[in-house]
Amino acid sequence: MSISANEIKKVRSLSEKKFRDRLGLFCVEGEKMVEEAMRSRFDVEKVYRKEEIGEEAMSKISALSSPSPSLAVVRKPKDINLSSDSDLSSCLGKSGLFLALDTIRDPGNLGTILRIADWFGIDAVFAAPDTVDVFNPKVVQATMG
């Protein structure tokens, strides 16, 4: 399997928020993360493996300094509204554990917070608009732990 120059450009562009938003896609890197994405409710659009596309191509599409053996392009879920108060207001008055975040700018910190929130069974996480994008490659990577 080969990868075209256009595919490389598209996957590489997903390291920037504006392209993730425009295309409705994000990347997941690493064997474990790709396997988890494939078992999850997320729609995996395409999986790239180093043994199939080659090390050079993998290093071109990876956002990591040391590319992992696999990378998946995943569709952002449509049922998560990251820019509206509607999700927050629908949760008010309901019981459960909720976490509110204010201005988390470091992607690694946000990923760690999300991983720990999941472990503790937090039902929903709300973040201020100026919080780093949850689909930032470093946030996604940090959720793995």
PLM regions: where:
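Short secondary-structure boundary/capping segments
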Residues: K17-K18, I61-L64, L88
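Structural motif
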Residues: G24-L25, E45-K46, P69-A72, G96-L99, ...
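RNA substrate-binding interface of SAM-dependent RNA methyltransferases
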Residues: R39, G93-G145
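Intrinsic disorder/low-complexity segments
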Residues: L82-L97
